Amino acid sequence: MKILSGREKAEQDLKQLKKELDELNLNRPIKLAIIQVGDKMESNRYVEQKLKKAKEIGIEAKCFKFDENITQKRLLLAMDEINENWDGILIQLPLPKHLPKEVILDAVPYEKDIDGLSHRNEFILYNEKNSDDKFFVPAAARAVLELIEHHEINYKKKKVAVVGRSHLVGKPVAHILKRRGASVSTFDENTPIKLVASADIVIVAIGVPKYIKAENIKQGAIIIDVGTNYDQNDPSVIFGDVDHESVKTKASAITPVPGGVGPLTVVCLLKNLVEIYK
């Protein structure tokens, strides 16, 4: 079974991105603001990775961390101030349940919405033939697509199953692959999982540990596991959304967790940020 690593490409792309930044010859560093509400361990880890990689290539990045119980009104007021002074703005998800996610995401100015999750950005992404406006592909979705291209996975006229319909991964990946010539079917927890078994390529981003097992895939299937799930008893242990031990006798190739889509996601976020200036 071939391992579809994303680490090497992530490091190469980060070096290339630094070179592009240097060539832009800006009179100040590009500035990235990360807005985090609460203190979830998983969110803290993701934020640390983003801050670290941004610093490596000369981007000025800062996390604005707010109390878990902050009101919608106070958060939006704080965001108004942040919007004035930062080039790219990212809302670290998930948000606490009392905050309406769509309202908070739409409070990020469209041109600074580097994770591409505002309604306006999504409208342009899914209707791009009718618009000349610039849009951002959500970083995790872009990472999946770039990893597929990097490993020269042929998806045109192939059956592709996208398990998970989130705005972060499943929905944009399915839309773009379909537009590029793949035969795409989408699934969620309410869809009969047995239908995945006919797919040549299975992309899994459903947020459920070890959701896909050997009996759910065909012999020789290529698996892209986007899931990152931390063991509650041992936070150093990470599971994907695929049971890797189970599928290893049937899959022809799979992305590792960690080390597959994850490293590329951070780099793709920074690519979106730098593209503001291109």
From Swiss-Prot:
Q: Which InterPro entries match?
A: Aminoacid_DH-like_N_sf (IPR046346), NAD(P)-bd_dom_sf (IPR036291), THF_DH/CycHdrlase (IPR000672), THF_DH/CycHdrlase_cat_dom (IPR020630), THF_DH/CycHdrlase_NAD-bd_dom (IPR020631)
Q: What is its EC number?
A: 1.5.1.5, 3.5.4.9
What GO CC annotations are associated with the protein?
cytosol
Which residues does the annotation say bind NADP(+)? Answer: 164-166, 228
Q: Which GO terms describe its biological process?
A: L-histidine biosynthetic process; methionine biosynthetic process; purine nucleotide biosynthetic process; tetrahydrofolate interconversion
- What does the sequence similarity comment in the record state about its family? Belongs to the tetrahydrofolate dehydrogenase/cyclohydrolase family.
- Please state what the protein is called: Bifunctional protein FolD
* Organism listed in the record: Mycoplasmopsis synoviae (strain 53) (Mycoplasma synoviae)
Show the taxonomic lineage.
Answer: Bacteria, Bacillati, Mycoplasmatota, Mycoplasmoidales, Metamycoplasmataceae
Gene behind this protein: folD
